[in-house]
C-alpha cells in the first residue's frame, strides 16, 4: 500500500510580510510513502539524510501519532525540482508531505487545519507551510498554539521569475543577523507596505507592487549575506518590465514579479 503526495515550492515573506505572508509556486516535490513489514528506507535524498533524523520521516511520525496510524516499516521516495536551502520552501515540502502522507493512510488528508497546526509546530512559523497546504497567497497569524490562515486569490496574469544562485544559505544563519528590535518608523513602513502589497496582488494594481514589496526588517540585513544582492535589487528596481522584487524566504533566491 502506498500514498503519493505532491507539494509545491513556496516563496515566503514577500518583502515586508516576514513570517506572515507566503505564496505557492509551480515547482514541486513529490513524495511516495509505502508501508513495509519492517525497517526504514529513504530514497532520493543525500545519504546523510537517509535516517531517522530525516525531516520527512519526522513529520510522518508526528502525523502518524496524531491520527493513530500503527505501522511496522516505511519507505519514503523523494522526487522533485525544489532546490535545497535556497529560500523556496524545500523543508516545508518535506514537512507537509510527511504529515499528509500519514493522514492519507487514515483517509484524513483533507483535515487541512490540523495538518497546518502540526506543520507549524515542526517548522516554527507558518509562512511557508501555509501556502504549501492551502495554495495561492496566504497570510497567517499565530496566537499561542493556534494558527489562523487565509488563502487569498491573486491575479493569474502575474508571473514569478526566480533568480536562484549556485550557493546555499541556511535559515539559521539568515535569522542570526536579524535585529532584536525595530524602530517605530520602520515598523510602520513595513505594516503599510504589507497592506499595499496584498491589496495590489488581489486587485492587479501594478503601481503598488514595487513599493509594496519593500522591506525594512530582514532584507537590509540578510542582503549582506548574499553576493551582489543590493546591486541586483537596484537593477530590478530600474527595469520597467519588473513590477516588484524581493528576497524569497531566507534567501538566497530573489523573486521578481512580471506580467
Q: Model segments located where?
A:
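Glycine-rich, charge-dense phosphate/pyrophosphate-binding loop(s)
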Residues: 14, 201-259
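Alpha/beta catalytic cores of group-transfer enzymes, especially the acyltransferase/condensing modules
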Residues: 110-158, 245, 251, 255
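Glycine-rich beta-alpha junction loops
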Residues: 27, 136, 164-169, 216-217, ...
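FAD-binding core of FAD-dependent oxidoreductases
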Residues: 9-24, 85-95, 123-138
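ATP-binding N-lobe of GHMP and related small-molecule kinases
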Residues: 1-86, 100-108
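Active-site rim beta-loop-alpha module in soluble metabolic enzymes
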Residues: 164-224
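DPxDG-like acidic metal-binding loop motif
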Residues: 27, 88-112, 133-138, 143
Amino acid at each position: 500500500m502506498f500514498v503519493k503526495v505532491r507539494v509545491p515550492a513556496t516563496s515566503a515573506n514577500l518583502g515586508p510580510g516576514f513570517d506572515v505572508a507566503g505564496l505557492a509556486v509551480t515547482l514541486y516535490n513529490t513524495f511516495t510513502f509505502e508501508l513495509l513489514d519492517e525497517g526504514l528506507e529513504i530514497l532520493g535524498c543525500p545519504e546523510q539524510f537517509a535516517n531517522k533524523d530525516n525531516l520527512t520521516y519526522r513529520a510522518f511520525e508526528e502525523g502518524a501519532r496524531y491520527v493513530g496510524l500503527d505501522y511496522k516499516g516505511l519507505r519514503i521516495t523523494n522526487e522533485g525540482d525544489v532546490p535545497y536551502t535556497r529560500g523556496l520552501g524545500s523543508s516545508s515540502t518535506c514537512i507537509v508531505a510527511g504529515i499528509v502522507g500519514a493522514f492519507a493512510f487514515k483517509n484524513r488528508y483533507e483535515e487541512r487545519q490540523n495538518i497546518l497546526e502540526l506543520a507549524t509546530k515542526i517548522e516554527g512559523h507558518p509562512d511557508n507551510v501555509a501556502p504549501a497546504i492551502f495554495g495561492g497567497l496566504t497570510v497567517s497569524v499565530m496566537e499561542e498554539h493556534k494558527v489562523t490562515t487565509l488563502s487569498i486569490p491573486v491575479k493569474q496574469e502575474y508571473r514569478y521569475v526566480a533568480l536562484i544562485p549556485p550557493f546555499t544559505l541556511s535559515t539559521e544563519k539568515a535569522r542570526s543577523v536579524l535585529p532584536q528590535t525595530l524602530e517605530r518608523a520602520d515598523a510602520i513602513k513595513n505594516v503599510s507596505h504589507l497592506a499595499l502589497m496584498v491589496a495590489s496582488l488581489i486587485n492587479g494594481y501594478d503601481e503598488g507592487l514595487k513599493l509594496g514589496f519593500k522591506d525594512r526588517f530582514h532584507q537590509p540585513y540578510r542582503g549582506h549575506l548574499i553576493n551582489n544582492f543590493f546591486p541586483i535589487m537596484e537593477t530590478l528596481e530600474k527595469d520597467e518590465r519588473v513590477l516588484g522584487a524581493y528576497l524569497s524566504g531566507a534567501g538566497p533566491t530573489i523573486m521578481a514579479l512580471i506580467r
